[in-house]
Amino acid sequence: MALVRSLLVAKKILSRSAAAVSAPPKGFLAVYVGESQKKRYLVPLSYLNQPSFQALLSKSEEEFGFDHPMGGLTIPCPEDTFINVTSRLH
């Protein structure tokens, strides 16, 4: 009985962590950034109107079209470039 209870608790924890990864908060968009190792970032939807962020999106469109290997929006640039661009948008 204790084993079943432990398994149920573990399942709840895993489902919560999986849901947290897959669903960004309202008003945000999840993007995956990096060249070889991808890291997930949450960016405000307001960034979509910014020309510098749109340039990153164009780069993504050129490389991937609408077929993103991570299942989400992937931006193929170095992580430090992404941080540099987005830090100017605050």
Swiss-Prot record:
Cystine residue pairs: none
Manganese found in the keyword field: no
Keywords of this entry: Auxin signaling pathway, Cell membrane, Developmental protein, Growth regulation, Membrane
Primary location: membrane
Induction statement: By auxin.
One Pfam family recorded for the sequence: Auxin_inducible
Organism of provenance: Arabidopsis thaliana
GO biological process: auxin-activated signaling pathway; response to auxin
Function: Functions as a positive effector of cell expansion through modulation of auxin transport.
Name of the protein in its database record: Auxin-responsive protein SAUR23
Keyword field contains Ribonucleoprotein: no
Protein family per UniProt: Belongs to the ARG7 family.
InterPro entries per the UniProt record, alphabetical: SAUR_fam (IPR003676)
Protein's membrane topology: Peripheral membrane protein
